[in-house]
Every structure is written in C-alpha cells, then in structure tokens.
From Swiss-Prot:
Disulfide bonds: C112-C187
Record's keyword annotation contains Transmembrane: yes
Keywords, sorted A to Z: Cell membrane, Disulfide bond, G-protein coupled receptor, Glycoprotein, Membrane, Phosphoprotein, Receptor, Transducer, Transmembrane, Transmembrane helix
Localization of this protein: Cell membrane
Function text: Receptor for oxytocin. The activity of this receptor is mediated by G proteins which activate a phosphatidylinositol-calcium second messenger system.
Biased composition (Low complexity): 360-389
Gene designation per UniProt: OXTR
Provenance organism: Macaca mulatta
GO molecular function: oxytocin receptor activity; vasopressin receptor activity
Full protein name: Oxytocin receptor
PROSITE patterns with a match to the protein in the record: G_PROTEIN_RECEP_F1_1 (PS00237), G_PROTEIN_RECEP_F1_2 (PS50262)
Family label: Belongs to the G-protein coupled receptor 1 family. Vasopressin/oxytocin receptor subfamily.
Residues exposed to the Extracellular side: 1-38, 98-113, 176-202, 295-309
Length: 389
C-alpha cells in the first residue's frame, strides 16, 4: 500500500533502502527488494550522524556540569535541548542504523511500537525545547522585568516533555509487527482509511515544522524590532550626552553617559545569546525543510520518485540538526569548552604528577633500604675484623 510505505518513511520506520515492487501494490504482496549499494551509503551516513550527535552533545552536557555558571537560564535550556538531541541519536538514529544493517525488524511487537514511539518523541522534544528557548530569549529582550523565573522555567520544560510524550502516542497505534510477505515480518504502519497517510503526515508536518517555524519567526521579528528600537534610543542618548548642553550639565551628563554605557554592555550580552539561538533556529530550518518537503511530496503525489537515491538520503539528513547544535554552542559559548578542556588538562596533570610522586617515593625507599643494608654490612665487617686478627 502506498500509504503504508509513506508513513514508514515519514518516521524512518522501514528500511529506506527497500524498494517496493509497485507504488500501487499492497505491501504484503511480496518482500521489498533491497538496494545494497544504497544501504551501505545509508549505514555510513547514519554512523557519522550518530557519532557526531553522541560525542557533541555528551561534551555539551559535561561542559555544563563542570562550569561555574551552571545555574544560568540559558544553560538550563541548553542542557535540555542537548538531552533531546541525545534522545534523537539513541532512539531515532541508532534504531534506523540497526534497521539498515539487518534490513528487517527483529523483535517482538511491543519493541516495534516502543521504538516507533521514541523516534517521534525525540523529534517533538528537540523542536519544542528549541521553541521554548526562543520564547525565553524573546521575553528576556522584550520584557526583561517580566521574564520567567527559574521555577517557571522548570515547569515549562517539564510541561514540554510531557506534551511531547502525549503527542507521540499515535505512533503506538499506527505501527505494529506485521507480515509483509509469506513468513516475513516487519515493523509496519497500517491506516484504515486511504486518506490516512496524507492526514497523518500533514499533521506531523504542521506540528513539528510549520507551526514552530511560524512562532519562531514571530519571536525573532519581535526581538529584531526591540533591538533596533533599543539601538535608536542609545544612539539618541549618546548624541544628547555628547552635545554642548550635555557637557554643561556636569554630573547629570556624566550620569547619563554611565547609564548609556551600562545599558550597552547588558544589551551586548543579551544580543549574543539571541544570535546563538537564531543560528540554532536557522540550522533547524535548513535541516528539516528538505525532509518535510520530501514527506509531503511522497504522500500527496502518486508519481513521486520514492525509489530515487537522493529522495531517500534526504530522509536521513534531518537528524543532522542534532549534530549541528553542539558546534553552535561551542561557537558562541567557547568558554564552556575552554573550562572543560582546562579541567581535563588539570586532572591529567594531577594524575601524572601523582604517579611521578609515587615512583619517586618508591625509589627513595629502595635507596634508603639499600643504604641501611650496606651500612650494616660494613659495620659488621669492621666489628668482625679485630676478632679475626
């Protein structure tokens, strides 16, 4: 069934290198043919994505744990976004990698439903935690006095995770272990109505991509307007302070200059965090746009080239978003990784120094014991010589 194949593609459920015998044929009519060359490319791409996502996000979490500013609100959101990216790596990329290696799903029906459920949980969590971080930056810039407190931040993150768990529930009912050929079982999606794949893929696209992108665009539109307005006010205040009337004002002019400079410093710090979240959002859009474009094309166009290699590889590149985020953190918060490297070097130096001290003390003990033995033997010889004479 065309709808079943499209649904499997949409969430990386079925081995993407499987080419169906016919677009209009039933999926249970015969086992799909396997494109071995394409499967090897998929395995290589997924291995690279998995390595980058695991290593990068693990370093971010370790750096956030060792930093002195671990209670920062921005770092709090970064931590949960890194956790979501690790969920994508472990429960979305890794199962798909194993699937491409084995070609078939080997496991019970419960494991099939659980894997498909967790794959979409990571997708929702990564998207909506990024949206929450952007809303926090919008409040910090537009309404700094009414920005969320830390306890509210925790509740918002908890509500986001719970919402993602609930929104992913349809996966449990759509996917199951089914017989796709005589004696051949696979984790497959089945829709009761023929319009089911179109409705489901469209809903996923709206919930994970289109609606978040609209909200993100609104957030950064407000942020850009507020920053532009703030720059205008600071420019006007600086011009007024440098005017002759401001110079004649004495202490008042100096106080105005002090206020302007302090506001400028605070704005630079906030603008830097806004730049970081904006680049993360841009990476999100770049990575997910081809994926959802191909998804919508596959279910709304019966003549879509579902067997084309480029069409299938694009399905895998959405997970690149989980690899990009750690490098963006490193670019804008380099002190985190600098502190992590320094901590690692200090621990390594302390370990090596401890080993050297241990070796030195051992050698001193051996030298002192040999000196005592030689001293005792010489004294014994001096005492024994008169008796023999």
């Amino acid at each position: 069934m065309e709808g079943e194949l499209a649904a499997n593609w949409s969430t990386e459920a079925v081995n993407s290198s499987a080419a169906p015998p016919g677009a209009e044929g039933n999926c249970t009519a015969g086992p799909p043919r396997r494109n071995e060359a394409l499967a090897r490319v998929e395995v290589a791409v997924l291995c690279l994505i998995l390595f980058l996502a695991l290593s990068g996000n693990a370093c971010v979490l370790l750096a956030l744990r060792t930093t002195r500013h671990k209670h920062s609100r921005l770092f709090f959101f970064m931590k949960h976004l890194s956790i979501a990216d690790l969920v994508v790596a472990v429960f979305q990329v890794l199962p798909q990698l194993l699937w491409d290696i084995t070609f078939r799903f080997y496991g019970p029906d419960l494991l099939c439903r659980l894997v498909k459920y967790l794959q979409v949980v990571g997708m929702f969590a990564s998207t909506y935690l990024l949206l929450l971080m952007s809303l926090d930056r919008c409040l910090a810039i537009c309404q700094p006095l009414r920005s969320l407190r830390r306890r509210t931040d925790r509740l918002a993150v908890l509500a986001t995770w719970l919402g993602c768990l609930v929104a992913s529930a349809p996966q449990v009912h759509i996917f199951s272990l089914r017989e796709v050929a005589d004696g051949v079982f696979d984790c497959w999606a089945v829709f009761i109505q023929p319009w089911g794949p179109k409705a489901y893929i469209t809903w996923i696209t709206l919930a994970v991509y289109i609606v978040p992108v609209i909200v993100l665009a609104a957030c950064y539109g407000l942020i850009s307007f507020k920053i532009w307005q703030n720059l205008r006010l600071k420019t006007a205040a600086a011009a007024a302070a440098e005017a002759p009337e401001g110079a004649a004002a004495g202490d008042g002019g100096r106080m105005a200059l002090a206020r302007v400079s302090s506001v400028k410093l605070i704005s630079k710090a906030k603008i830097r965090t806004v730049k970081m979240t904006f680049i993360i959002v841009l990476a999100f859009i770049v990575c997910w746009t081809p994926f959802f474009f191909v998804q919508m094309w596959s279910v709304w166009d019966a003549n879509a080239p579902k067997e084309a290699s480029a069409f299938i590889i694009v399905m895998l590149l959405a997970s690149l978003n989980s690899c990009c985020n750690p490098w963006i953190y490193m670019l804008f918060t380099g002190h985190l990784f600098h502190e992590l490297v320094q901590r690692f070097l200090c621990c390594s130096a302390s370990y090596l120094k401890g080993n050297r001290l241990g070796e030195t003390s051992t050698s001193k003990k051996s030298n002192s014991s040999s000196f005592v033995l030689s001293h005792r033997s010489s004294s014994q010889r001096s005492c024994s010589q008169p008796s023999t004479a």
